Amino acid sequence: IAQDLSFYGHDLYGESRLAELVRGIAALEGIEWIRLHYFYPSQFPFDILPLMHENPKVLRYFDLPLQHISDRMLHAMKRHTTRAETEELLRRIRKEVPGAVIRTTLLVGYPGETEQDFEELLKFVREQRFERLGVFPYSHEEGTYAYERLEDDVPEAVKQERVARIMELQES
C-alpha cells in the first residue's frame, strides 16, 4: 500500500525497487493477481513495464493522477513534470504494454487556470482517450500551498462547467 508507488525503494536504496518487489509478490503461492495503484508521472519506474507485459499476475492497469497537461498549470501545481514528458510516458505504456488500461484524475479550476489552459486539457483528453477518467473541481483547502499563497480566482460555476465538459467528452 502506497500513496505513490513510483518512489518505492528510493528511501533505502536511492533507486526504484518496485519491479523487484512485484516479482517477489507474484512468485508467492496463492497470489492470483496484483494491481498497482498510483504512479506519479515525474518518477515513473519504467522497469515495471516489461514485468507487466510478461507476467499475467500483474494487471496491465495504470493509475496516473496527471491533474493537468498545461505546462503552466503543471508548474503552478508543483507537479515536477511537463506535457512532453507525460505524453512520452503514455506513448511508452501503450507501446510496451499492449492492452494497458490507463486511468487518470484531473483537476480543473486551480488558481490561475485560464480558458486556454482548460482548452489544452480538453484537447489532450480527446487525443488520449483514457479508459477511465475522473475529474474534480479545485477546492480551496486550509493547510495547502495553494490556500496559503494563491487566490481561488476561478468561479465555482466555471469549475463545475469544466468538470461537466470533460466528463461529457470522456463519455462520448
Put a short name on every predicted segment.
Residues 1-115:
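Conserved SAM/AdoMet-binding glycine-rich loop
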Residues 57-60, 72-172:
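A structural motif corresponding to the C-terminal lobe/cap of the Radical SAM core domain
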